[in-house]
Amino acid sequence: ALSAADAGLLAQSWAPVFANSDANGASFLVALFTQFPESANFFNDFKGKSLADIQASPKLRDVSSRIFARLNEFVSNAADAGKMGSMLQQFATEHAGFGVGSAQFQNVRSMFPGFVASLSAPAADAAWNSLFGLIISALQSAGK
């Protein structure tokens, strides 16, 4: 779990991003796939598709809304060690089953603070780094 201070910073940073989660979620995936094109292949709906096709896909909002809902759960429970432990274990098991591992989340960790900043949300780079560090550690523990 994160410290109460880091959890508070995350909540402040995340609130304006999640407030417009449909548009921002889609923008996040487009930014991820622009910086790391191979990431799209981990999503059945986007595998082998061009960025233009992904942007035009009605599935973009469906997928991004699921991602943002899960991220919202992590942000909302970031200071609760018990909840975070079980959530991270479930998340890692699910993602290992999809073939998604720590390397993919290293990519997300490297670009997410900049994505948040691009939306003029309050910076919380160290707190985001810590949250994604927990996710990466859980994936490594799951063998990914």
From Swiss-Prot:
Q: Which Gene3D superfamilies match?
A: Globins
Keyword Transport included in the entry's annotation? yes
GO MF terms listed in the record are:
heme binding; iron ion binding; oxidoreductase activity; oxygen binding; oxygen carrier activity
Specify the Globin domain's residue ranges: 1-144
Alphabetized Pfam families for the sequence: Globin
Q: Which PROSITE patterns match?
A: GLOBIN
Highest taxon of the lineage: Eukaryota
**Residue positions binding heme b:** H95
The alphabetized UniProt keywords are: Acetylation, Heme, Iron, Metal-binding, Muscle protein, Oxygen transport, Transport
Keyword Cell division carried by entry: no
| Residues modified as N-acetylalanine | A1
Q: What else is known?
A: This molluscan globin lacks one of the heme-binding histidine residues found in most other globins.
- Share what the entry says about its subunit structure, partners included: Monomer.
Give the family this protein belongs to, as stated in its UniProt record.
Belongs to the globin family.
Name assigned to this protein: Globin
- Write down the species: Aplysia juliana
